[in-house]
Structure formats: C-alpha cells, structure tokens
Swiss-Prot record:
Secreted protein that functions as a cytokine and growth factor and mediates its signal through cell-surface proteoglycan and non-proteoglycan receptors. Binds cell-surface proteoglycan receptors via their chondroitin sulfate (CS) groups. Thereby regulates many processes like inflammatory response, cell proliferation, cell adhesion, cell growth, cell survival, tissue regeneration, cell differentiation and cell migration. Inhibits mesoderm formation and promotes neural formation during development. Plays a role in development of the neuromuscular junction (NMJ). GO terms for cellular component: extracellular region. PANTHER family: MIDKINE (PTHR13850:SF2), PLEIOTROPHIN FAMILY MEMBER (PTHR13850). Its main location: secreted. This is Midkine. One of its GO terms (biological process) is neuromuscular junction development. It comes from Xenopus tropicalis (Western clawed frog). The gene is mdk. It comes from the Eukaryota. Disulfide bonds join C36-C60, C44-C69, C51-C73, C83-C115, C93-C125. Belongs to the pleiotrophin family. The lineage of its organism: Eukaryota, Metazoa, Chordata, Craniata, Vertebrata. Keywords: Antibiotic, Antimicrobial, Developmental protein, Differentiation, Disulfide bond, Growth factor, Heparin-binding, Mitogen, Secreted, Signal. Pfam families: PTN_MK_C, PTN_MK_N. Residues 1-21 form the signal peptide.
C-alpha cells in the first residue's frame, strides 16, 4: 500500500513539474509585446557580398529591432530588393541601341520602401534568332 501511494505522489509531482516547465518554455518563446504600431524599416543589408541572408533594422519611438531578411541574387539592383514589379513582355530590338526594353509597374512595396511607380529594364538584343521547333521529338509512332 505504501509503495502504491509513493508511486501516485511521485507521478503527480512529475506531472506538475513538467506542466510548469512547458508553461515557462511557452512564455519564454513570446517576445515582449510592443505597443508600437508605426515601425520604420530600413533596407535589407546583406551579411556578405551583395545578395543572400542579411538583416533589416526597424525603429519605432525609442525601440529598435533587427529582422532577418534575404536579398535574392537575381534582383535588379536599380529597383531595390523591396520593390516588386509586374513587367510586360520584352519589346522589339532597337537597331540603333542594340537593346530591348520593357517597363514594369509597381505591384508591391515591402516594409514601406520608397519605390518608383514605373521602371524600365533593358537588355542587349540576342545575336541569333531562335527557331521554333517543328514538332515533338521523342519516342512514338510516325
């Protein structure tokens, strides 16, 4: 009888301690809630080179926070990594400049970034013209 009572007390103690530990862990995961609503975020600064993982600093009143961010390595540096644009198809090749042009309209500005409403992108004209395939290649009946 004493062994049974001891086991029950031990089990209850174990459950109480583990539930308290879980509660403390949950509270530790929550960061201090801020009453700030008007955050001003800076641009994403990469940790090395000009793309990849980095940090972004934000301020609100006297509070400062840093967030992890990522700059894609194929971004157009002239437009900024926080400005997302919807681009049209490439235009015809301009023989005098040797370039194609397309324009884009602002789709989304992340972190209140200062973005241009419309932008233009250029690329050199390709030297060869691509021929369209004349049919499916592969196995099959002719």
């Amino acid at each position: 009888m004493e062994l049974r009572a001891f086991c029950v007390i031990l089990l209850i103690t174990f459950l109480a301690v583990s539930s308290q530990a879980a509660k403390n862990k949950k509270e530790k995961g929550k960061k201090g809630a801020s009453d700030c609503t008007e955050w001003t975020w800076g641009r994403c600064i990469p940790n090395s080179k000009d793309c990849g993982a980095g940090t972004r600093e934000g301020t609100c009143k006297e509070e400062t926070r840093k967030l992890k961010c990522k700059i894609p390595c194929n971004w157009k540096k002239a437009f900024g990594a926080d400005c997302k644009y919807k681009f049209e198809n490439w235009g015809e090749c301009n023989a005098t400049t040797g370039q194609k042009v397309r324009s884009g309209t602002l789709k989304k500005a992340l972190y209140n970034a200062d973005c241009q409403q419309t932008v233009e992108a250029t690329k050199p004209c390709s030297l060869k013209t691509k021929s369209k395939s004349k049919g499916k290649k592969g196995k099959g009946k002719e």
